[in-house]
Regions:
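Glycine-rich, mobile lid/loop segments that gate access to catalytic sites or pores
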Residues: 1-48
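Phosphate/pyrophosphate-binding loops at sites that engage ATP/ADP/AMP, CoA/4′-phosphopantetheine
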Residues: 1-7, 109-122, 200
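A structural signal for well-ordered alpha-helical segments within the folded catalytic domains
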Residues: 9, 103-107, 186-190
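Condensing-enzyme catalytic core mediating Claisen C-C bond formation in acyl metabolism
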Residues: 13, 44-111, 115, 157-171, ...
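Acyl-CoA/ACP chain-elongation machinery
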Residues: 15-29, 93-98, 132-138, 182-193, ...
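Short glycine/threonine-rich loop-to-helix capping motif typified by GTGT followed
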Residues: 97-102, 130-153, 164, 180-182, ...
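Short glycine-rich phosphate-binding loop at a beta-alpha junction
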Residues: 122-128
């Protein structure tokens, strides 16, 4: 915040936006809206974070059926038509980094873009691991959607909300959808699949050909111990 000028208000905007998205998700843990003002007024956890900026731990489960293109042909036509293609799947391990170094998700994202033969501008919508709402701002920068230090402004300008140029965490993110820990990563994949199939209802992204999910866990110094970036493409 001191280096790049990211504000508490911008973090609150990200939180409020995700609470709105969560209010449209019948599977979200928190299905209510929270204004930017109320996010800022909420109980402080550790400055600049208030309670409404932090993900709640909750129960949950998620599953996915994965098969080869050849194996898909053995399924009924209606299932084949709903299949989602894995364009890239990358898992990167962390190391001790200084606060000045780019994060592990930048490493994983670059590999994923190469694997998928895509660029950040090709991604239509994103799910990121927002254990806190600051994480969303940070990951937008690491994933290459905006320049380092400009994530807060990018969010505040409304680009990441439903109907924006890059909708982020249409599920509500961890902050609103909830953080079922072991099921969190796969729940992001579920949201991508729902969006790619055009089945997200009121929170449906208009542009829904290609989606990206970033998930991280563990800690090494200032960094995640592991990070995955997955890019999926719809069949339409």
């Amino acid at each position: 915040m001191k280096t790049y000028g990211t504000t508490q208000g911008q973090i609150a905007f990200a939180a409020s936006k995700n609470h709105f998205h969560g209010s449209l998700n019948e599977k979200a843990q928190y299905q209510f809206e929270v204004s930017v003002e109320d996010v800022l007024k909420d109980r402080e956890i550790s400055y600049p974070l208030t309670r409404a900026m932090c993900a709640p731990i909750g129960d949950g489960a998620a599953a996915a059926l994965i098969c080869s293109e050849k194996g898909l042909k053995h399924f009924p036509t209606e299932i084949q038509q709903r299949a989602i293609k894995i364009k890239a799947s990358v898992l990167s391990g962390g190391k001790y980094r200084t606060p000045q170094e780019t994060g592990l998700s930048r490493v994983a994202a670059k590999k994923a873009y190469r694997q998928a033969d895509l660029e950040p501008k090709d991604i239509n919508f994103v799910e990121v691991h927002d254990a806190t709402s600051f994480c969303e701002i940070y990951q937008l920068e690491m994933l290459g959607f905006c320049e380092i230090g400009t994530g807060g402004k990018f969010v505040e300008e409304g680009h990441t909300q439903l109907g924006g140029k890059l909708p982020v965490n249409l599920s509500g993110g961890l902050v609103s959808k909830g953080h079922p820990v072991g099921a969190t990563g796969l729940s992001m994949i579920h949201e991508l699949a729902v969006q790619l199939r055009g089945e997200a209802g009121k929170r449906q992204s208009k542009r829904n050909k290609i989606g990206l999910a970033e998930n991280g866990g563990g800690v090494i110094g200032f960094e995640e111990a592991a990070c995955s970036v997955i890019i999926l493409e719809g069949s339409h």
